Amino acid sequence: MNTSLSWFEQLDVLLNATDGNVVRNKQWLYPLGVSTELIGLCICFFCSSGCIFLGSPPQNSTAVTPAVLWEESEIMQKELKLLQYQLSQHQELLLKQLAEGRQAQVGSWKIPRGAPFLTWSPASFSSMPRVLSKRTYSFGAPKCS
């Protein structure tokens, strides 16, 4: 770009040169669910002269270069990996707690080993028929008087 142009004019030239490509990229990326921030970052990253921020004219000491953007992207990738690791650890903890909760719930459904009816001896069942036999039941048809 011509350095004799003001930064507004440089921006205008840059935007006019890239408008067609940006529109095509957006039309291609929007159906894929790519956010506008990510599209803007990609456009900014591949801009050969660095990003031009609208708030103030670019300063040589603070100009964003592809190398700086690459370093920032590497930092963001490391942060993303850290967040993924933390998320997987949290997910494992939640799954463990869920499994423990299910075990506790299943344990409440189980019959304890010392339950009285599990410890009765067969001899205690032999008295039941005698008790039942002492009672008289009439299973026949009801008698009419």
Curated annotation (Swiss-Prot):
Its main location: membrane. It is a single-pass membrane protein. The gene is CCDC163. It is found in: Membrane. Keywords: Membrane, Transmembrane, Transmembrane helix. GO terms for cellular component: membrane. The chain crosses the membrane at residues 38-54. It comes from the Eukaryota. This is Transmembrane protein CCDC163.
